[in-house]
């Protein structure tokens, strides 16, 4: 059974390539050792989605029409998700593993990850309760996911009686942020909420710290993970927080088992583990579980059956012993140099 992994291998999101591909290889090795998917050995095909719809569709067409893959796991930005689903979703299963907006998706897309509202609400409640934060400035990239994250933030801040002090949407290119940083400094915000992708988050946070703002206000960042923090550097992560359903330092038996498999496979020089890679690992196991559930390895049949309303619940149930688990917890982590230390679960703040 040939499974494709479609994700950006360059550009702002390319920094996750090593961890995504390493985690996928661990998942495939684990499944093949247990008999593959219903007796069929799995082989992986890696494909570059690029960062625009044209490149993503060209890659998707090649995967299905030329490579003849039986399923596609997407770990790319959300603006590519619906076009890819529309192009291939009726022919092969399409599983999307990136954190996403929580909006209604195409019927042919099975999304497994947690959503922005699921993360933002407990995080904002915690920031309000524990840090007395009521004034927020938002910075995101200029495409679907950050704009929907900003919409969720505005709604949630309004519900808790807080205030949005300003916002900015940045292109996914390297840029100087002097004017924006002056706006943030003058805004009176307690917290800068970020929805920046990969290298964009690295660049912004380095400049934020260089301007001395890291000593004056908190930063709460979506999808700032172990990879991004390493890129930002130890001198620029003061007062930087993130929340996610997965951090490598979350101490659970499920995660300990995964980390053992991962480091046994790649040793001390393994790419850092992060949610991006773990999502793909779980996507592979979800596909295998649904193939068993529906008693089929036929791509079109699986794609049709996975459109059912119970597929996501069945997939997450099958992941009960995997790192994130059946019912994802939401963890808060604080940067300590170039690591993220999990401080607590914040589900209770929902």
Show which residues each predicted segment covers.
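Extracytoplasmic "Venus flytrap"
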Residues: 4-25, 49, 271-277
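Extracytoplasmic ligand/sensor domains, especially the bilobed periplasmic-binding protein
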Residues: 69-164, 216-221, 227-234
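Extracellular/periplasmic periplasmic-binding protein-like sensory domains
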Residues: 208-279
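Short, well-structured alpha-helical segments in soluble
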Residues: 46, 50-70, 126, 175-188
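Periplasmic-binding protein-like
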Residues: 63-76, 95-97, 137-138, 188-204, ...
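Segments of small-molecule ligand-sensing domains
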Residues: 265-277, 288-342
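Signal peptide-proximal N-terminal region
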Residues: 23-44
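Short beta-strand segments enriched in small/hydrophobic residues
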Residues: 1-19, 75-76, 133-140
